[in-house]
């Protein structure tokens, strides 16, 4: 129990603190879910408090720069979600996720189906990669958590939907596995995901998970 910020700090501390992941002078990329232009109370996106706390922890660990981005589905999602304001107050930098020029064609030799894609260069270039989605119901994939959040790092998400979505989600993790996974299940969306209709779609759980293992954290979620 506690606030999101308190739970993020406690969860990261159990893994050795942010200094176990971030060294002084390193660049960090944080990938929340900011797909939708909806206010925080609707639970469609990662809560701004969760993202901002991760930015603060990275800065305190000595990160040179902390970049935050998503490949949004709605225009204005950075602002409408409250994430942009929170990140900038915490000392982070919002990076454009909606411009194809920011994505680099990358091969994926371990993949079964999703063998090549354009991946956001912020993910490819960062010293440390953190993923931090909310736990939600999803009409297409049943649930969305850390592995599904990887979809927002590639340009052509449509190709994933057309070609065995579940396998493509698993394949996409191989482009680059996150160093730290934080799953915000404080107020998960249990129906009508991934966007939701109203706050009745949310259930208070006051839970937050953190792990180095993206498969383990999704299984626990």
Which residue stretches match the model-derived regions?
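N-terminal and secondary-structure boundary signal
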Residues: 1-220
